[in-house]
Curated annotation (Swiss-Prot):
Species the sequence originates in: Staphylococcus aureus (strain NCTC 8325 / PS 47)
InterPro entries (alphabetical): AAA+_ATPase, ABC_transporter-like_ATP-bd, ABC_transporter-like_CS, ABC_transpr_CbiO/EcfA_su, ECF_ABC_transporter_ATP-bd, EcfA_1, P-loop_NTPase
SMART domains named in the record: AAA
Free-text function comment from the UniProt entry: ATP-binding (A) component of a common energy-coupling factor (ECF) ABC-transporter complex. Unlike classic ABC transporters this ECF transporter provides the energy necessary to transport a number of different substrates.
Subcellular location: Cell membrane
Protein family: Belongs to the ABC transporter superfamily. Energy-coupling factor EcfA family.
Assembly description: Forms a stable energy-coupling factor (ECF) transporter complex composed of 2 membrane-embedded substrate-binding proteins (S component), 2 ATP-binding proteins (A component) and 2 transmembrane proteins (T component).
Gene: ecfA1
Gene Ontology MF annotations: ATP binding; ATP hydrolysis activity; ATPase-coupled transmembrane transporter activity
The name this protein goes by in its record: Energy-coupling factor transporter ATP-binding protein EcfA1
Broad class of the protein's primary localization: membrane
């Protein structure tokens, strides 16, 4: 399979948890464009988080194939590919493994047997990129939720990944911390040409993406640009998704355009 523009490809993927009678994913196919921000959205139980687990090897497909840079992912090559894909989870407390910030960032490097001098350099650079270098010696209980997520991103960046997955990474943050984290991820994506995959139930987060995949009942419901996805907002509310605030206001005002960012709403008003 040859697709130079896609970093990850799902081809007819189905998955079923052992405890479930029905399939969580049913014949799912999509491409993740290289160097872009893709949001995979859906309500609870839509299959979106299972997709993240399959991408990083926590779970394995029952049928179908997953490709990474045109190479089919198998048991034989997965560990080699895995270091290219980093993930930031929902709860920052559950992913903090070091006693202080710099040890947490160094943890993954130690597992990959990175030499000490190189490790020290990478830890410092990664913390500097996320504006946490001054807190390198802090304990996790001295950090806010947003700061812990910054450390989680630094831990991923230190490994020089090609792809970063955010699995509901902003859902436990207050609005300001959430926006700050998204701004940071956008900056990291731009500076390092990293592919971002955001797994979320929050459609306002999808508004910032280059590419959006909407999941519903284990299948791909819609796929396209943010403008294309929000062009028919009724299709999104029909499957239980909550529309972003600016789009709701735009509808209330009777404007024709469905897709509207916060900045666009201000201009309209």
């Amino acid at each position: 399979m040859e697709d130079k523009n896609s970093v990850i490809v799902f081809k007819n993927v189905s998955f079923q948890y052992q405890s479930d009678a029905s399939f969580t994913l049913k014949d799912v196919s999509f491409n993740i464009p290289k160097g872009q921000w893709t949001s995979i959205v859906g309500h609870n139980g839509s299959g979106k988080s299972t997709i993240a687990k399959l991408m990083i090897g926590i779970e394995k497909v029952k049928s179908g194939e997953i490709f990474y840079n045109n190479q089919a992912i198998t048991d034989d090559n997965f560990e080699k590919l895995r270091k290219d894909i980093g993930i930031v989870f929902q709860n920052p407390d559950n992913q903090f493994v070091g006693s202080i910030v710099k040890y947490d960032v160094a943890f993954g490097l130690e597992n990959h047997a990175v030499p000490y001098d190189e490790m020290h350099r990478r830890v410092s650079e990664a913390l500097k990129q996320v504006d946490m270098l001054e807190r390198a010696d802090y304990e996790p209980n001295a950090l806010s939720g947003g700061q812990k997520q910054r450390v989680a991103i630094a831990s991923v960046l230190a490994l020089n990944p090609s792809v970063i997955i955010l699995d509901e990474a902003t859902s436990m943050l207050d609005p300001d911390a959430r926006q700050n984290l998204l701004d940071l991820v956008r900056k990291v994506k731009s500076e390092h040409n990293i592919t971002i995959i955001s797994i979320t139930h929050d459609l306002s987060e999808a508004m910032e993406a280059d590419h959006v995949i909407v999941m519903n009942k284990g299948t791909v419901y819609k796929e396209g640009t943010a403008t294309e996805i929000f062009d028919n907002a009724e299709e999104l509310t029909r499957i239980g998704l909550d529309l972003p605030f600016p789009i709701k206001i735009n509808q209330m005002l009777g404007h024709q355009t469905s897709f509207l960012t916060y900045e666009g709403l201000v201009d309209q008003l």
